[in-house]
Amino acid sequence: MKCATLSLVLSMVVLMAEPGDAFFHHIFRGIVHVGKTIHKLVTGGKAEQDQQDQQYQQDQQDQQAQQYQRFNRERAAFD
């Protein structure tokens, strides 16, 4: 009986809320956020990590190339 009363009172509160309160919008936004997070974990998490790894490797190669060029310039200046 208490559960029935509670559900009736809560439904009345929801129905009496003004559209500006955006109660349903918050619930919908939360559901969408959870769905996107789950989708990212299932499909996109691996691709994002691979992209970060690839960027890190490219940065390392660029840094090595700059060091090699600097070394060659210093060696040429020394000769």
Curated annotation (Swiss-Prot):
Compositionally biased intervals (Low complexity): 52-68
Keywords, sorted A to Z: Amidation, Antibiotic, Antimicrobial, Antiviral protein, Fungicide, Immunity, Innate immunity, Secreted, Signal
Stored InterPro entries: Antimicrobial12 (IPR012515)
Record's subcellular location: Secreted
Position of the signal peptide: 1-22
Domain of life: Eukaryota
Role according to the record: Antimicrobial peptide with broad-spectrum activity against Gram-positive and Gram-negative bacteria as well as against a variety of fungi. Rapidly inactivates both channel catfish herpesvirus (ED(50)=4 uM) and frog virus 3 (ED(50)=13 uM) over a wide temperature range. Seems to disrupt the membranes by adopting an alpha helical conformation.
Similarity field: Belongs to the pleurocidin family.
Name used for this protein in its record: Moronecidin
Classification of source organism: Eukaryota, Metazoa, Chordata, Craniata, Vertebrata
